[in-house]
């Protein structure tokens, strides 16, 4: 085990050193003129103020939940003896606090780097496209590497502390079950970070657009708009802090779920089957570092997306090569009858996961790109009014769920069968195959997250150049990067929901394993869920309902918070003379403060609904009903998230397609109709949709933590 631990912690150290180097590179860059710095400072101040207040709210809720976890697990394990029950409960409670802290820290790092990179990317645009591209991507890379390294460090350290280093088989096998609290803590913070950030960003965006662009007739990012700084702050709190916590949770949950499944194969692989997910994560970090340094564009006229795709391709190739050797060395055990495990089939599961990630990126691009049929259909429908825009956009969103579901299903089936063929006649072999496929898909997480954070950095850079009155040639550079950033944000949402779907299949399987352990059944036996029982049917019904109820409250929260912003912007236009003439400065801080309070107030109820419901289902209706709740909740959540993400993205880009000069261009009736569709789609793609990625993993980790209480 020593050599593998050296590899894991060695990679964490390398990631830390690279992060330090990237931070030094970014902070050494020029910060532009005084006006640019003033705008950047206002964005930074607003973003960090929101994050600090949000984390105070989350921390108070997390402490209450930690106490409930300890008490629930103590009483749930009392049959094993008082001292053993207390030890188990404290281990799970501490893991929850650790996961919550690491998730919050990853969000903080993402936010801090974004608000310090945006001004430097804007200033770098004066030296050309490549300089600005390098600054923005490396700012995003700090987030990507920090999130994945923190996740790896947290899971690995807890595993070792909870028995992984003991040398005793029973303690090593028990350790993954004790660290499920880490996944729940990560999920808990991620839900509120994504939800609160999503409400903030869309409330500010909708408020700024409706009063600024529609009522006052001023352009986007115009310094006369009192909500413009709040809008730029929103780009960071939703896409940096929120997505950072989301993918931190995905990697942590996938690692823990795969480690629990590895316990079932202990007679064949020993501790290597449990440790393999951590080694795979370490390999992914190194591959992402290599890919990041391959990104550059010597030809300034080329689409910067080509350079980013090159880095993604390099990351994938390095991953595939390194994971082949990892599978060969770690998963080449022997079956009970003496035959060797076919590691090539297990490697096939890795390739399946990698291919699925590419397919998801391609499908998301197809349904949200201005160059493709779906978006152009919505743009054409806008020529006959807002109603036909909404009807066509809804249709596109619904259509966009079909192919992703088919490919997810195919990937799960193929990976499951490859696992069964590689390790025949072992009950959990197929599930381990799907775990390996999930590792393949998530192996590029650090690079994907770098691309995602690249989006808000370039968006802010464009806003800063616009508000500071920078020359037209600099704005052209930042506009090209901003367009590229919009693409990366859309693509990473597709990647996030695909990885969430695979990760939750693992967690569902891990839940069934935990139930078998509690019932004293062999780990390779079956836990039957009788769909004919009314409790099971009711649990499934509630699982489907909770997804829609949560989305409803999240979307409504955006509407309520946006009303606060709209009223404030109207008040300032009315009461502060000279704003429209440019002779008086709007009160940006007031608008930021109002949307901050509104977002934090509105995020609590949707979040609590998700946390409480699965516990009540398990306690009142039982373990089988909780399993049905998980399965149907996951299926409904994935499909609805695809609809919301892709539908919202398509509405957004239909507006951009018209703004390029099609169907009358800006100011035309078609453009006005497309603005309505874009406004409807905003809370879909940036609030409810991304929050569902977290929800489907959260309900799985909650049931894992509280399963001992279920009847």
From Swiss-Prot:
Mg(2+) 1 binds at residues 205, 209. Keywords: Calcium, Cell membrane, Hydrogen ion transport, Ion transport, Magnesium, Membrane, Metal-binding, Translocase, Transmembrane, Transmembrane helix, Transport. It holds the Pfam family H_PPase. It catalyses: diphosphate + H2O + H(+)(in) = 2 phosphate + 2 H(+)(out). Its EC number is 7.1.3.1. GO terms for cellular component: plasma membrane. Its main location: membrane. It is a multi-pass membrane protein. The record marks 239, 246, 686, 697 as: Important for ion transport. The record marks 489 as: Determinant of potassium independence. Ca(2+) binds at residues 652, 678, 682. It is found in: Cell membrane. The chain crosses the membrane at residues 7-27, 58-78, 85-105, 145-165, 179-199, 251-271, 274-294, 311-331, 343-363, 403-423, 431-451, 495-515, 535-555, 602-622, 624-644, 690-710. One of its GO terms (molecular function) is magnesium ion binding. Substrate binds at residues 202, 685. It comes from the Bacteria. Coiled coil: none annotated. Its cofactor is Mg(2+). Mg(2+) 2 binds at residues 235, 459. Belongs to the H(+)-translocating pyrophosphatase (TC 3.A.10) family. K(+)-insensitive subfamily. PANTHER family: K(+)-INSENSITIVE PYROPHOSPHATE-ENERGIZED PROTON PUMP. NCBIfam families: PRK00733.2-1, PRK00733.3-5, V_PPase. Homodimer. Proton pump that utilizes the energy of pyrophosphate hydrolysis as the driving force for proton movement across the membrane. Generates a proton motive force. This is K(+)-insensitive pyrophosphate-energized proton pump. The gene is hppA.
């Amino acid at each position: 085990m020593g050599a593998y631990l050296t590899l894991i912690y060695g990679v964490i150290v390398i990631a830390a050193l690279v992060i330090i180097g990237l931070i030094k590179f970014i902070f050494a860059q020029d910060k532009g003129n005084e006006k640019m710095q003033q705008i950047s400072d206002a964005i930074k101040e607003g973003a960090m103020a929101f994050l600090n207040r949000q984390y105070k709210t989350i921390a108070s809720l997390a402490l209450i939940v930690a106490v409930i976890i300890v008490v629930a697990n103590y009483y749930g394990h009392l049959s094993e003896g008082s001292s053993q029950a207390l030890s188990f409960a404290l281990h799970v409670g501490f893991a929850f606090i650790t996961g919550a802290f690491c998730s919050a820290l990853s969000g903080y790092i993402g936010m801090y780097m974004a608000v310090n990179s945006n001004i430097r990317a804007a200033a770098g645009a004066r030296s050309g496209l490549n300089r600005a591209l390098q600054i923005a991507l490396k700012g995003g890379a700090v987030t990507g590497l920090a999130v994945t390294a923190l996740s790896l460090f947290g899971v690995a350290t807890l595993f070792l502390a909870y028995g992984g280093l003991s040398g005793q088989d029973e303690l090593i096998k028990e350790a993954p079950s004790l660290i499920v609290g880490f996944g729940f803590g990560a999920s808990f913070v991620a839900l509120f970070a994504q939800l609160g950030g999503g409400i903030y960003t869309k409330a500010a965006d909708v408020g700024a657009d409706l009063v600024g662009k529609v009522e006052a007739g001023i352009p986007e990012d115009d310094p006369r708009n009192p909500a413009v700084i709040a809008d730029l702050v929103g780009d960071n709190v939703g896409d940096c802090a929120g997505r950072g916590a989301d993918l931190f949770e995905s990697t942590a949950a996938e690692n823990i779920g795969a480690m629990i499944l590895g316990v079932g194969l202990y007679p064949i692989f020993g501790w290597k089957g449990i440790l393999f997910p951590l080694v795979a994560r370490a390999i992914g970090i190194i591959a992402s570092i290599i890919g990041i340094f391959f990104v550059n564009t010597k030809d300034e006229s080329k689409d910067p997306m080509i350079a980013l795709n090159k880095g993604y391709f390099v990351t994938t190739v390095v991953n595939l090569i390194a994971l082949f050797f990892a599978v060969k060395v770690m998963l080449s055990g022997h079956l009970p009858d003496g035959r060797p495990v076919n590691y090539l089939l297990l490697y096939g599961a890795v390739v399946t996961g990698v291919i699925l990630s590419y397919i998801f990126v391609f499908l998301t691009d197809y349904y949200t790109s201005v160059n493709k049929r779906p978006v152009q259909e919505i743009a054409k429908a806008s020529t006959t009014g807002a109603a036909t825009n909404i009807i066509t956009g809804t249709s596109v969103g619904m259509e966009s769920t079909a192919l992703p579901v088919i490919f997810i299903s195919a990937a799960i089936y193929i990976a499951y069968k490859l696992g069964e063929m590689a390790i025949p006649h072992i009950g959990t072999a197929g599930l381990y195959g799907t775990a390996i496929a999930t590792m393949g898909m998530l192996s590029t997480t650090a690079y994907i997250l770098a691309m995602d954070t690249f989006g808000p950095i370039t968006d802010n850079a464009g806003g800063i150049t616009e508000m500071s009155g920078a020359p037209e040639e600099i704005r052209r550079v930042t506009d090209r990067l901003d367009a590229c950033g919009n693409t990366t944000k859309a693509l990473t949402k597709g990647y996030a929901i695909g990885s969430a779907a695979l990760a939750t299949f693992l967690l569902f399987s891990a839940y069934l394993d935990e139930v078998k352990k509690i019932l004293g059944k062999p780990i390779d036996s079956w836990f039957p869920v009788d769909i004919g029982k009314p409790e099971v049917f009711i649990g499934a019904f509630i699982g489907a309902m909770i997804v829609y109820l949560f989305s409803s409250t999240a979307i409504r929260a955006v509407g309520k918070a946006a009303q606060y912003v709209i009223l404030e912007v109207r008040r300032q236009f009315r009461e502060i003379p000279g704003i429209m003439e440019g002779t008086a400065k709007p009160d940006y801080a007031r608008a930021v403060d109002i949307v901050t309070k509104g977002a934090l107030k509105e995020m609590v109820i949707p979040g609590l609904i998700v946390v409480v419901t699965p516990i009540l289902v398990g306690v009142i209706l039982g373990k089988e009903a909780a399993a049905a709740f998980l399965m149907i909740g996951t299926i409904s959540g994935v499909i609805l998230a695809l609809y919301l993400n892709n539908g919202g993205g398509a509405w957004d880009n239909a507006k951009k397609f018209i703004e390029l000069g099609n169907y009358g261009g800006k100011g035309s009736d078609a453009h006005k109709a497309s603005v309505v569709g874009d406004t409807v789609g905003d809370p879909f793609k940036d609030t409810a949709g991304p929050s569902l990625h977290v929800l489907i993993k959260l309900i799985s980790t909650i049931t894992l933590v509280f399963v001992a209480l279920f009847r």
